[in-house]
């Protein structure tokens, strides 16, 4: 290399040093000063990892005095370059010696980097191109946002999430029966709204007891990092912002907290949200004359927030007025009058009955035919297909079909059987004595509920006298029984749930010390990470725990359907909690009958509660939609019976009779009131199954796995294969970046297999929607990784020394989240020969790539320097060809956008004529969006993203 004092060079290995200046040439050594950092580097002249900086005619260059010039001529004198041209600010002619170039010049354009010798590995060029292709495909994919959740592919959930998640500012009521996954549906909708850019700020309002469950569900299932806001958090956040709720984008808050703290509620109102989610919305009490404070708060928020999701118990359970109150929150203009709503419901009831006949395939009665004809013009009942089309139209025109989704177990397949096993046991003398002493000492006070709860858990009474020691496990017959059950079913996974964390801890110790049974605990005193580890240990097939012992609160939000044995060591006083316990195993996807084991102590409140649940409500072997209203109706009598703790059979029998008299007619009424039309609409039918099939095919796509592993390799992320479809990722010592997006410093265990992720809470499910994959692609495309490369092509059919230039352009418009589904950044690949002909369409990337051999940076730089004028010319010709191709891409995007949005607009306008639930704001939004996207698509620009220079060789 001919070095001369004053020349400008750039380091190949330390590009952040900026431009270097040769300050000494002595013997075999050369010294460069890098003025931007003040550092010196001494190199051996023959092997110096530096590249000469030279610019070409037409380039714009910056000077050390912060003005720029356009180069018109390049001269050389005594080994130094002189750039002749004009200043860009005043058109003054100038001649600039290279020593006066800016010290901070960076080569961001791929052609500048190529000519400056900043040549990357060929494998990184390939990775960059694949990142562009995959990003483009993913943003066009209509299922984007659905595949990324750690959820089973359940048709009705996917359909609701897809249907609602694609709307602008969705305002809907999710009213699926318990166990059908309303929380998952809401999570998928939130995930899609955030990924598509339709929403940025989300507020979830919940009862305090559900906050942690939602926090875990959103994080573990959807990688959404919500923040819990209470008074302490608000005080902390006040240091960063006047309104603490503006310090986070995703917030979970207790409705009760806001009700008690008026100032905090005012701050929540002042913060701007895109989506409001309210769980347990049926607890928002409302009457025409006296709405509750909680209802008024949600109403005030719903008036300001564009999107609203209300999660509620099934409408039928709570009466029409309560149902109307929630619909009124979603659209007060549409649901303005309760009496009018009742009249409309009654009229719709006749339509639903007629639709029932249509669905059953029977000959339509005259009344049904007349009703359907009034709803559907040109009614054709000639065959099954015509009937199905008629049903589809009715679904679209359904009275509340756009705002209400409700599925029941009766119309959803895939749930397991439930079988109850009961084990009566004698009350130990130690408990009898403890109860007697408690009574003598006046410890039997408190309200009815407190006394009832006390007798349900006699071990707690005993421990009041014993202290910290848990010797109750030595004489309680339920412990011996549990040991025998576990020993007799060594190969079975068993989930044990009890009310208190202390009970779970004591049981685990007893099982371990007495019989060496492998178990683990799971309770609210553990961190999320500790719970993940416990869950993973339980899920592990070889060498894992046989039994997982959960507390009531600790088990919230977790599902263990790989187990089929459930032990209810004690019973909760609330029927909703009982269903929640059973729901840990009774999920869609459970392969076996759920065996429910209930031990109880005879002659105690435990026996009475077990019989009330089973003989009164049949709540163990069936889901019980009537449980809540029946429980409220007999609450005081039940509590009195339990608080007496006498085993009074006469009183118990009377209570069971009353319970059944309430339960059975209500259950029959709910069944008769089922809205088949609404259920078919909510379940999605064939459309839902198509979604499942599409997502299952995406799960089986090995291309994503291949790309991910290649990306981790190139960036420098360590990968350790742990078997069982598991891979441990940790930051490498020599990564291209200081940290990889979404990868903690202590690493992460990932899997690409959905069933594995569903059974292992300690593993992340990697998909195209996962933050690590999206962040990794953004990292590559937002940097210069792989932007330049040089390779050799061994091909004796071509003249030796022939050159090819591979140009990767990207056609993109201004960033707009709604634009991506029509015009995402689109790669355009050209393969130019020396004559400027584009061979890209004839020579596929993958096949061509396999024929190439990489070269090192120094040889690559020499090859580029020798062909620099030719490369300049080919880039110019390629730009012209790419512009022509871009025009075609823009035309297709414009047509696709216009057709899609016009179809949506036409459908909604037609629907509005027969269904008032279509909001004017939706129509206005689509019209405005159409005009805005049309303008943005027309503004699409072309940029050169990557270059690969190829030289033909015969060796």
UniProtKB/Swiss-Prot annotation:
Domain Helicase ATP-binding: 163-333
Annotated GO biological process: regulation of DNA-templated transcription
PANTHER family: DNA ANNEALING HELICASE AND ENDONUCLEASE ZRANB3 FAMILY MEMBER, SWI_SNF-RELATED MATRIX-ASSOCIATED ACTIN-DEPENDENT REGULATOR OF CHROMATIN SUBFAMILY A-LIKE PROTEIN 1
HAMAP family, per the entry: Helicase_RapA (MF_01821)
Positions with a binding annotation for ATP: 176-183
PROSITE patterns given in the database record: HELICASE_ATP_BIND_1, HELICASE_CTER
Keywords for this protein: Activator, ATP-binding, DNA-binding, Helicase, Hydrolase, Nucleotide-binding, Transcription, Transcription regulation
Record family assignment: Belongs to the SNF2/RAD54 helicase family. RapA subfamily.
Motif, DEAH box: chain positions: 279-282
EC number per UniProt: 3.6.4.-
Record's protein name: RNA polymerase-associated protein RapA
Species of origin: Aeromonas salmonicida (strain A449)
Gene Ontology terms, MF aspect: ATP binding; DNA binding; helicase activity; hydrolase activity, acting on acid anhydrides
Broadest EC class assigned to this enzyme: hydrolase
InterPro entries: Helicase_ATP-bd, Helicase_C-like, Helicase_RapA, P-loop_NTPase, RapA_C, SNF2-like_sf, SNF2/RAD54-like_C, SNF2_N
Positions of the Helicase C-terminal domain: 478-642
Task performed by this protein: Transcription regulator that activates transcription by stimulating RNA polymerase (RNAP) recycling in case of stress conditions such as supercoiled DNA or high salt concentrations. Probably acts by releasing the RNAP, when it is trapped or immobilized on tightly supercoiled DNA. Does not activate transcription on linear DNA. Probably not involved in DNA repair.
Taxonomy, superkingdom: Bacteria
Subunit structure: Interacts with the RNAP. Has a higher affinity for the core RNAP than for the holoenzyme. Its ATPase activity is stimulated by binding to RNAP.
């Amino acid at each position: 290399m001919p070095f001369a004092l004053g020349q400008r060079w750039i380091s190949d290995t330390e590009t952040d040093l900026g431009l270097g200046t040769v300050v000494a040439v002595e013997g075999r050594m050369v010294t460069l000063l890098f003025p931007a950092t003040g550092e010196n580097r001494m190199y051996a002249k023959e092997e110096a990892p530096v590249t000469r900086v030279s610019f070409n005619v037409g380039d714009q260059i910056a000077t050390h005095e912060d003005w720029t010039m356009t180069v018109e001529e390049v001269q050389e004198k005594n080994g130094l370059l002189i750039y002749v041209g004009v200043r860009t600010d005043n058109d003054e002619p100038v001649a600039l010696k290279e020593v006066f170039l800016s010290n901070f010049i960076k080569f961001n354009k791929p052609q500048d980097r190529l000519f400056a010798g900043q040549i990357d590995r060929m494998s990184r060029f390939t990775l960059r191109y694949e990142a562009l292709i995959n990003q483009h495909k993913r943003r066009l994919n209509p299922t984007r946002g659905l595949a990324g959740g750690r959820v089973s592919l359940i048709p009705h959930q996917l359909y609701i999430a897809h249907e609602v998640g694609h709307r602008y500012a969705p305002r809907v009521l999710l009213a699926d029966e318990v166990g059908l996954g309303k929380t998952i549906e809401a999570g998928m909708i939130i995930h899609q709204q955030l990924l598509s850019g339709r929403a940025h700020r989300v507020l979830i309002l919940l009862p305090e007891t559900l906050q942690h469950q939602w926090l875990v569900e959103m994080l573990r299932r959807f990688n959404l990092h919500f923040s819990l806001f209470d008074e302490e958090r608000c005080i902390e956040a006040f240091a960063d912002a006047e309104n603490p709720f503006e310090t986070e984008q995703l917030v979970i808050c207790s409705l009760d907290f806001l009700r008690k703290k008026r100032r905090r509620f005012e701050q929540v109102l002042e913060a701007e949200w895109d989506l409001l989610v309210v769980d347990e919305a049926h607890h928002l009490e409302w009457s025409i004359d006296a709405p509750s404070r909680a209802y008024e708060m949600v109403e005030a928020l719903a008036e300001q927030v564009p999107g609203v999701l209300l999660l509620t118990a099934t409408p039928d359970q709570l009466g029409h007025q309560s149902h109307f109150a929630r619909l009124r929150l979603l659209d007060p203009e549409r649901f303005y009058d309760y009496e009018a709503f009742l009249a409309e419901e009654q009229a719709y009831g006749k339509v639903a009955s007629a639709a029932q006949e249509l669905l059953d395939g029977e000959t339509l009665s005259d009344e049904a035919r007349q009703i359907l004809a009034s709803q559907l013009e040109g009614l054709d009942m000639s065959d099954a297909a015509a009937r199905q089309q008629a049903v589809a139209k009715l679904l679209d025109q359904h009275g509340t079909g756009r705002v209400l989704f409700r599925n029941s177990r009766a119309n959803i397949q895939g749930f397991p059987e439930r079988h109850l096993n009961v084990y009566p046991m004698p009350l130990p003398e130690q408990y009898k004595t403890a109860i007697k002493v408690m009574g003598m000492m006046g410890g039997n006070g408190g309200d009815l509920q407190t006394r009832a709860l006390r007798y349900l858990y006699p071990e707690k009474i005993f421990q009041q006298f014993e202290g910290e020691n848990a010797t109750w496990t030595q004489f309680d017959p339920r412990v011996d029984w549990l040991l025998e059950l576990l020993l007799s079913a060594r190969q079975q996974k068993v989930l044990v749930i009890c009310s208190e964390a202390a009970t779970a801890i004591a049981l685990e110790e007893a099982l371990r010390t007495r019989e060496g049974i492998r178990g683990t605990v799971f309770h609210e005193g553990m961190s999320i990470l500790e719970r993940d580890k416990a869950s993973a240990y339980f899920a592990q097939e070889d060498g894992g725990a046989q039994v997982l012992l959960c507390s009531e609160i600790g088990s919230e939000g977790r599902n263990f359907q790989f187990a089929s044995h459930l032990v209810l060591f004690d019973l909760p006083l609330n029927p909703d909690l009982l269903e929640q316990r059973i729901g840990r195993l009774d999920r869609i996807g459970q392969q076996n009958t759920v065996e429910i084991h209930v031990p109880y102590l005879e002659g105690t409140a435990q026996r009475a509660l077990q019989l009330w649940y089973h003989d009164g409500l049949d709540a163990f072997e069936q889901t019980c939609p009537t449980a809540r209203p029946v429980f409220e109706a007999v609450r005081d009598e039940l509590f009195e019976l339990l608080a007496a703790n006498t085993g009074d059979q006469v009183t118990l029998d009377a209570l069971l009779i009353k319970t059944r008299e309430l339960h059975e007619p209500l259950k029959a009424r709910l069944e008769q009131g089922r809205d088949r039309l609404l259920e078919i609409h909510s379940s999605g039918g064939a459309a839902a199954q198509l979604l499942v099939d599409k997502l299952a095919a995406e799960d089986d796509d090995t291309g994503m796995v291949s790309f991910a592993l290649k990306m981790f390799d190139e960036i420098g992320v360590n990968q350790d294969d742990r078997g069982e479809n598991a891979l441990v990722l940790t930051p490498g010592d020599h990564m291209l970046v200081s940290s990889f997006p979404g990868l903690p410093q202590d690493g992460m265990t990932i899997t690409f297999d959905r069933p594995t992720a569903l059974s292992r809470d300690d593993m992340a499910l990697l998909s195209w929607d996962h933050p690590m994959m999206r962040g990794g692609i953004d990292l590559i495309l937002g940097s210069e990784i792989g932007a330049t490369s040089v390779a050799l092509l061994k091909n004796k059919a071509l003249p030796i020394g022939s050159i090819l230039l591979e140009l990767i352009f990207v056609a993109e418009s201004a960033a707009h989240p709604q634009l991506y589904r029509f015009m995402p950044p689109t790669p355009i690949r050209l393969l130019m020969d020396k004559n400027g002909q584009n061979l890209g369409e004839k020579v596929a990337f993958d096949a061509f790539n396999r024929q190439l051999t990489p070269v090192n940076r120094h040889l690559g730089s020499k090859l580029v320097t020798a062909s620099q004028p030719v490369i300049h010319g080919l880039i110019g010709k390629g730009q012209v060809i790419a512009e022509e191709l871009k025009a075609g891409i823009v035309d297709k995007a414009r047509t696709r956008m216009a057709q899609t949005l016009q179809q949506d607009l036409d459908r909604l306008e037609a629907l509005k004529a027969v269904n008032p639930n279509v909001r004017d704001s939706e129509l206005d939004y689509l019209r405005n969006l159409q005009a805005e996207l049309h303008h943005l698509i027309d503004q699409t620009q072309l940029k050169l993203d990557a270059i690969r220079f190829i030289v033909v060789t015969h060796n």
